[in-house]
């Protein structure tokens, strides 16, 4: 996989997890 794609995917997962955590609390 492309390095840029990996970085974007990681950032996307981070943002989603952060949003889910904030909603849970």
From Swiss-Prot:
Which Enzyme Commission number(s) are listed? 1.13.11.-
Q: Name one GO biological process term.
A: catabolic process
Sorted keywords for this record are:
Aromatic hydrocarbons catabolism, Dioxygenase, Iron, Metal-binding, Oxidoreductase
Q: Which residues form the signal peptide?
A: none
The top EC class, named as a word, is oxidoreductase
The keyword Cell division is annotated on this UniProt entry: no
Factors inducing expression: By chemostress caused by the herbicide 2,4-dichlorophenoxypropionic acid and its metabolites.
Q: Which cofactor does it need?
A: Fe(3+)
GO MF: dioxygenase activity; metal ion binding
Say yes or no: keyword Lipoprotein present. Answer: no
Q: Which reaction does it catalyse?
A: 3,5-dichlorocatechol + O2 = (2E,4E)-2,4-dichloromuconate + 2 H(+)
Instruction: Tell me the pathway.
Output: Xenobiotic degradation; 2-(2,4-dichlorophenoxy)propanoate degradation
Say which domain of life the source belongs to: Bacteria
Cofactor mode of binding and number, as noted: Binds 1 Fe(3+) ion per subunit.
The family classification in the record reads: Belongs to the intradiol ring-cleavage dioxygenase family.
Under what name is this protein listed? Answer: Chlorocatechol 1,2-dioxygenase 1
Q: Which organism is it from?
A: Delftia acidovorans
User: Mind giving the lineage of the organism this protein is from?
Assistant: Bacteria, Pseudomonadati, Pseudomonadota, Betaproteobacteria, Burkholderiales
